[in-house]
């Protein structure tokens, strides 16, 4: 055990608090750089979840849709644990059918 680990243990410091603060700051910066207001971001999140839920059952309690910034590039990241696919019958619209081969 290093001296720093001993002092941290003695003072019961939470090593994760610095990481949590860093993640929060990155989230704030991502929101600022993307120029998306919170209402629009929430609407996007709901719509993304709605579309994904049409095809697979997702665990909403464990899921997360967020903005992440790396090297001045902001990305919308959806981390959605999939429970199982939803059974669907394949429908082909008349306009999508292939023309008959001669």
UniProtKB/Swiss-Prot annotation:
Keywords of this protein's UniProt record, alphabetized?
Cell cycle, Cell division
User: Is ATP-binding included in the keywords of this UniProt record?
Assistant: no
Record-level GO BP terms:
cell division; regulation of division septum assembly
Pfam families, per database record: MinE (PF03776)
Q: Which domain of life is it from?
A: Bacteria
| Family matches, as InterPro entries | MinE, MinE_sf
> To which protein family does this belong?
Belongs to the MinE family.
As for what it does, the entry says: Prevents the cell division inhibition by proteins MinC and MinD at internal division sites while permitting inhibition at polar sites. This ensures cell division at the proper site by restricting the formation of a division septum at the midpoint of the long axis of the cell.
Q: By what name is this protein known?
A: Cell division topological specificity factor
């Amino acid at each position: 055990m290093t001296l720093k680990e001993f002092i941290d243990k003695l003072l019961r410091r939470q090593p994760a608090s610095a990481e949590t603060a860093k993640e929060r700051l990155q989230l704030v910066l991502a929101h600022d750089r993307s120029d998306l207001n919170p209402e629009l971001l929430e609407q996007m999140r709901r719509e993304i979840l709605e579309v994904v839920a049409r095809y697979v059952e997702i665990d909403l309690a464990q899921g997360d849709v967020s903005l992440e910034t790396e090297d001045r590039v902001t990305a919308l990241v959806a981390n959605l644990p999939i429970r199982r696919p939803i059974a669907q019958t394949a429908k082909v619209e008349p306009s999508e059918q292939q023309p008959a081969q001669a």
